[in-house]
A protein has these predicted regions:
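Short, cysteine-centered beta-strand-loop-beta hairpins and adjacent loop/turn segments enriched
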Residues: 60, 89-102
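Short beta-strand segments enriched in hydrophobic/aromatic residues
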Residues: 27, 86-88, 125-128
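A short hydrophobic beta-strand element
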Residues: 77-94
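A short, structured loop/turn motif at beta-sheet edges
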Residues: 73-82, 113-120
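Short, aromatic-enriched amphipathic alpha-helices that serve as compact interaction elements
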Residues: 1-19
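Short, surface-exposed coil-to-beta transition loops
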Residues: 66-68, 83, 104-109
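A solvent-exposed, acidic/Ser-Thr-rich amphipathic alpha-helical stretch
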Residues: 2, 20-75
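Short beta-strand edge/turn micro-motifs at domain boundaries
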Residues: 103-132
Length: 132
């Protein structure tokens, strides 16, 4: 279970480290990959679109921090479902206008992972409960 939660932590740590390359390493580059989010566009996204939007999101937030709260990990053979509450904080930066806005978001997430040689994310669903 520890290696599963580590994959989720690597995903969100990208917001702190800005090491965007790991996003492609921990997610399954396959037509089977999908993601949903509460950030437009709201449609079901494929691997390439998800990576591009994640990179844009993580580089647009400075002083990023997060907390995964009450994770529930269910393992089924070579797949796992991780459901959790999520607190994200940081400064949303507009580099063109040289402005920033503090953000604090309480949300929830569900990640589905599969294991071949290593655990990889095959589906992400993130949603806001409220902005603080």
């Amino acid at each position: 279970m520890e290696e599963i939660i580590k994959v989720i932590e690597i995903f969100f740590d990208t917001g702190k480290t800005k090491n965007l390359g790991v996003l492609k390493d921990i997610q399954l580059n396959s037509p089977d990959f999908s993601s949903f989010s509460d950030v437009p566009p709201f449609d079901l996204k494929d691997f390439a679109t998800s990576i591009a939007l994640e990179e844009l999101r993580f580089v647009s937030i400075s002083d990023y921090d997060y907390e995964i709260i009450k994770p529930k990990i269910s393992i089924f053979d070579n797949s796992a479902v991780v459901a959790f509450e999520l607190l994200q904080k940081g400064m949303l930066v507009d580099n063109k206008a040289f402005t920033g806005e503090h953000m604090s978001i309480t949300g929830r997430g569900t990640f589905v992972l599969i294991k071949n040689e290593a655990w990889k994310i095959v589906h992400i669903h993130l949603s806001k409960i409220k902005d603080s």
